[in-house]
Amino acid sequence: MIKIGSHVRFRKPDYLFGAIQESLENKANTAMIFLGPPQSTFRVKPENYKLQDYQKHFFKQIPPEDIIVHAPYIINPASPIKAQFSNDFLVKEIEKINYIGAKFLVLHPGFFTSFTKEVAKKQLISSLKSILEKTKNVILLLETMSGKGSEMCANFEEIVEIVEAVESPRIGICLDTCHVWDAGYDLKNFPEFCKEIRRTRLINYLKVIHLNDSLSPLGSKKDRHANIGKGFIGLESLRKIIFDPLFANIPKILETPYVDNKPIYDQEIALLLKKV
């Protein structure tokens, strides 16, 4: 089954009900939300989410297990200085996700900043273990990054090494096509790209795909998303991910730019699903 959707707005007054309604209007069957502003740890109380309205009207069209939550960008579980704040926040975030019944929490691995990468790697593994020990049900997904600055997890070997070191069935990977392209993985050479995903064992842990085009050339380490078919990756390569059996049943989530201050996810989903 093809699962495709996008980031949708989780905002007052309708929160979860409104987000899933927007997804269905886009002809999606999966969705991704932030539980607050992406650049903030501010959160409203779960009783404001309009969970019962969602359950009454949309539960069957997009069930909770097909709702993906993204952690805010500003936390850094790989930093020995910031890890405690990040970990405490994520434990509370997972409690809110359990209230919804969602399955996955996507997390940027963080930056090693002034520390060595090895120190940051050990801290990240420790953070993930601590968060999982204090929570239940939700699966943490580390996201593949572009390698901008001191970002962690910009290559497949590193992210798989970290995931395997955590040693938990509740840890996995979210692959972002823009990020991995910018990190140097050539999606235009699709057979080789799939071979690399298998060789590094990343496929064993892949639970969600962020499907984005890139404004930047291969290996640029920029992390600038483009609309589908408007970037350097191109529609043909991104469409292959939709239909290739290797990625069957994995939710594909669009995080592409707005056009004229409006999302065009409905158009992009239709474009991707159109067989040529």
UniProtKB/Swiss-Prot annotation:
Residues that, per the record, bind Zn(2+) 1: H70, H108, E143
InterPro entries with a match to the protein in the record: AP_endonuc_2, AP_endonuc_F2_Zn_BS, Xyl_isomerase-like_sf, Xyl_isomerase-like_TIM-brl
Binding residues annotated for Zn(2+) 2, in chain numbering: E143, D176, H210, E255
Keyword Hydrolase (UniProt): yes
Keywords, comma-separated and alphabetical: DNA damage, DNA repair, Endonuclease, Hydrolase, Metal-binding, Nuclease, Zinc
UniProt-recorded name of the protein: Probable endonuclease 4
GO MF annotations in UniProt: deoxyribonuclease IV (phage-T4-induced) activity; DNA binding; DNA-(apurinic or apyrimidinic site) endonuclease activity; phosphoric diester hydrolase activity; zinc ion binding
EC number: 3.1.21.2
PROSITE patterns: AP_NUCLEASE_F2_1, AP_NUCLEASE_F2_2, AP_NUCLEASE_F2_3, AP_NUCLEASE_F2_4
A single BP term in Gene Ontology: base-excision repair
Function: Endonuclease IV plays a role in DNA repair. It cleaves phosphodiester bonds at apurinic or apyrimidinic (AP) sites, generating a 3'-hydroxyl group and a 5'-terminal sugar phosphate.
Cofactor(s) recorded in Swiss-Prot or TrEMBL: Zn(2+)
Leading EC class: hydrolase
Pfam families noted in UniProt: AP_endonuc_2
HAMAP family with a match to the protein in the record: Nfo
